[in-house]
Amino acid sequence: MATAVVKALKKKFQDREIIVVSPHSGLWMNNPDVYRIYLMGQTPYFYEDFIKDKDTIVIKSDPYLHQDYINKKVHCIEAWCVQNDVEYNGEEPEIFLTEQEKLEAEGSLINHGKPILLLQTNGGSGEQYSWVRDMPYKTAAELCKKLQEQYKILHVRHESQPSIDGIDWLHSPNIRQVLAAVQYSHARLLIDSFVQHASKAYGKRSTVLWPVDKIGQLGYDLHDNIVSSYEPVKTHMADYYLTEDDIVGQSHMCPFPKDKDIGKISLKIIETIF
């Protein structure tokens, strides 16, 4: 989403060089709107080189704290722009791959003998499960059984995250290799994480599961968005601050009932993929 914000920033500050400090430098590589990229925490002499005694505009903000985002009135991208007094005109995420990156991705995926389906079940980089965002393991495993005959399923995940029996793992320390695989995949079954944003950047319609409905704030109309349906169990919201469900998904506030039926959800997902 940040690439969309930078695109809007460049339209406002056309005579400025944009320097990005990010934990994910690979997302920004070759972006024509960006002058320099620095990895967060690796910024030697940054203040002296770019800020001290210079006419520099510093933009550092958290869109998740914007009033209209909290109140579910605007998408995160728009909130981010408005928060920094930048006009939002529907800018969308962007990724810029070289032709060599595309060729390597295509070559690595072409020999599986089946169309490629990318599966992402967990977000973040840790092993903790978030009921707010992540796909239930039981749902993912059942879907894989039904889809693996037609598709070669590649599971996008970190080493510490749960695997699914019989499903190959797609991971690389170079996030751009994963992003390139997104472009050359045939179908995608995702959650709200970086692959759904990359799919939007490529215009690749995907199926995205939402345990909690945050489509208006974090999703895209391009995708087939499937929201879980359930009768919530009463839980106290004592630990919520500015939102009714933080991304961590604290266990003692999970409203999902026991043995929530996944049959109808699984069928709907399969229908969107086929």
Features from the language model and the residues they span:
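Catalytic machinery of carbohydrate-active enzymes
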Residues: 1-274
